[in-house]
Amino acid sequence: MVGNILVTGGAGYIGSHTVLQLLLGGYNTVVIDNLDNSSLVSIQRVKDLAGDHGQNLTVHQVDLRDKPALEKVFSETKFDAVMHFAGLKAVGESVAKPLLYYNNNLIATITLLEVMAAHGCKKLVFSSSATVYGWPKEVPCTEESPLSGMSPYGRTKLFIEDICRDVQRGDPEWRIIMLRYFNPVGAHPSGRIGEDPCGTPNNLMPYVQQVVVGRLPNLKIYGTDYTTKDGTGVRDYIHVVDLADGHICALQKLDDTEIGCEVYNLGTGKGTTVLEMVDAFEKASGMKIPLVKVGRRPGDAETVYASTEKAERELNWKANFGIEEMCRDQWNWASNNPFGYGSSPNST
């Protein structure tokens, strides 16, 4: 299927990398983003990287909760499918500000689904998260593993998964794929697009890169008393380009008339500790990272990594990059863009 694709949150980290892959694949791509946690600079760079395909990109600054504005976007283009990345994603912030997360993530998604249905667009790829597995009793996590929202953020992902299942059950014309991805890291090999979180980062690798370029004094290691090989948490880190490719495979799978509502893990199937990841980044950058060991964060699980067999079998997708390539590309992005998409610490 090559057609018109709407990408919500397309100016963000994962969204921008996926938009580039869509353009290179020949898709006409429309991005909507409220730019609360992202920058239009990323979209301009995507356009540049896409070369001649960049002319097939349109951008609207729209909040998904603004139904009239969303209706206008849908009235201008007949979409074949939607990729839904938009949403807030910081576990710690969600614990402190649960209503912000429920309002932003749930209402936005419900509004999107309503407008899609009204315009006869019933194909959706939804960005879920491995956070729905909570603190798993067994690893690797399969798509059938027990689910548990350990934070308001995690619960929004769980709720949206249930909403998607209910929507498809109520109207079998819907085809929905929900992608539970693990820990996205790295950047496009060009060094032109990457992760640029607003404020102090919540995730490991953007935090690491801000320490290395001198924007933060040290890296806080949250929890060093886990029952893992070095006491730090274990995660399944996946290169953002692999993740973007997984979304393209999911989009193509929506051509399957029998898909219904399906869920797939996107990860490498390998667990890496926080300290192992820090060591790999030090090797890639040639820099020493000052560490400060602090207590565990509420809502953080000990060990989480994916079983990827279902995605390999049904989506014909497999992660290609290891942590060395992830850190190499992350450092390439960080060293070329020490202030992200801005030109100074205070610019956006």
From Swiss-Prot:
The keyword Nuclease does not apply. Ubiquitous. Optimum temperature is 30 degrees Celsius. NAD(+) binds at G12, Y13, I14, D33, N34, L35, D36, N37, D63, L64, F85, K89, K157, Y181. Coiled coil: none annotated. Pathway: Carbohydrate metabolism; galactose metabolism. Its cofactor is NAD(+). Optimum pH is 7.0-9.0. This is UDP-glucose 4-epimerase 4. It comes from Arabidopsis thaliana (Mouse-ear cress).
